[in-house]
Amino acid sequence: MNERDQVLKAAADLVSAFAGNDREAYFGAFSADASFVFYTLEQPLLSRDAYQVLWDTWRSEDGFEVLACTSSNAFVSLQGDVAIFIHDVATELRMQGEQHFSQERETIVFKKQASGQEQQGLWLACHEHLSAMPEGLPPP
């Protein structure tokens, strides 16, 4: 499998884990030092642990549950051992007993794990940036 296909698979696995509420697989797709920028939060999350704490709070206090998540319009730009993955994402989730639907655009930066690292050769996400979809665009 070429590197572009490896990144596409890593991204598909990440989205699938998110869609399935598979916390272990979802956070396992990110490096420990990953950062996260979500337009719905006032501040960036500067580690995987920080995001996991927030995720667990959402689940315990707000009944957070992902009901569906689909990716479309994927694009990969390889930059050596770094890959930039861009896609449109449609998400359905439940919080505080209410269903929410969102259409967003997301950039995920993947880094190929170097030799000697525990997950050598795997592409792990090291940054995620979620943006609101511009108004007036048709749904995917």
Language-model segment annotations:
Residues 101-140:
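Short beta-strand edge/turn micro-motifs at domain boundaries
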Residues 35-37, 84, 124:
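General beta-strand recognition
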Residues 2-5, 23-78, 88, 100:
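A solvent-exposed, acidic/Ser-Thr-rich amphipathic alpha-helical stretch
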Residues 36, 45, 92, 116, ...:
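Flexible, glycine-rich phosphate/dinucleotide-binding loops
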Residues 1-29, 136-140:
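Short, low-complexity N-terminal intrinsically disordered segments enriched in polar/charged residues
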Residues 14, 55, 71-76, 89-91, ...:
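Hydrophobic/aromatic beta-strand elements that line small-molecule binding cavities or substrate pockets
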Residues 92-100:
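Short, cysteine-centered beta-strand-loop-beta hairpins and adjacent loop/turn segments enriched
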